[in-house]
Amino acid sequence: MKPPAETLELALRTFDPGLNVASIREYTLAVIQMIEAGWDEGADLVLLPEFTWMGLEPHVLRQVGSATLADVAQAFDSECLPLLKERLQRQGRAAVLGTVPSLTPEGGVRNRAWIVRDGGWLFQDKLHLTPWESGFEAGDVLRLWSFGGFRMAVIICLDIEVPELSVRLRDSDVDLILCPSATETLRGVERVNRCASARSVELGCHVAVSHLTGRAESELIDENIGRAAFYRPSQAAFKALPFAEESETVTSGVTRLEVRLEKRPLDLMRRMTAETNPALLGKELAGIQRHIPVECA
């Protein structure tokens, strides 16, 4: 049976950067294979985690003698990105390729998620940085983009924990937030996923999360734990569906979560104005554009 109109098949993947490969090219091909396999299995969009590409670090070190963030960024730009653009050109398919250090024209380094859709490329930089990311500079733009009839945004790890950022998306009709993440503790996994669920309620949208797992020869991502997760709005239009789908939490290897999105429940929810729904308050009623003082009693 043909799926209903305006559906989207998601493949959420954790990723273990400790790949047994011999070169930067082999590492890139392994990532390409994971994405193409997801597409071949029916996914319209594949989501990989934050710092997927920091597993390049030991290969960059052997090749150029050092592996600073800038070195990794240059290796990705010169060796990985051209190969990715050559191979990932499939129409009607999209992927968020995790994140990688990326050089700015001014010489800074940003934590960047590359996105491919229908063979075209765009990116999202991380906007809020952890204490461990002192070598990066924060991004300054949150991009909205569309694919398959759905409006999307990529919000990276700590950014999902900042409700002030989700405030910027009120009244935007965002349908899906994609959150690549990396954390070394179970508490970090819980924090990211609980906030992802909250963003789903606040904005009335779907939120998908993919965490990094495993070990890597890297000071930045030496140990990782995580899972794949998906959250829906807690509204009547979604009552026949689970509000959360989560894989098991793992410390290594790849876990998989396949999810089908349908546009109809989102559209129905947005028409149900008599239902209590924080997503329908808009910026003015939510107290963003009107002054609500805080008083101490």
Regions found by a protein language model. Give the residues of each.
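Active-site catalytic loop in hydrolytic enzyme cores
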Residues: 103-172, 185-195, 251-268
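Beta-strand-turn-beta hairpins that frame and shape the catalytic cleft
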Residues: 1-10, 144-153, 176
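CN hydrolase (nitrilase-like) catalytic-core segments centered on the catalytic cysteine
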Residues: 76, 81-94, 161-251
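Cys-nucleophile CN-hydrolase/nitrilase-fold catalytic domain and related Cys-dependent amidase chemistry
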Residues: 25-117, 185-198, 202
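Short hydrophobic-aromatic micro-motifs
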Residues: 46, 150-156, 178, 208
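C-terminal beta-strand edge segments of enzyme domains
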Residues: 213-297
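Short polar catalytic/cofactor-binding loops
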Residues: 14-21
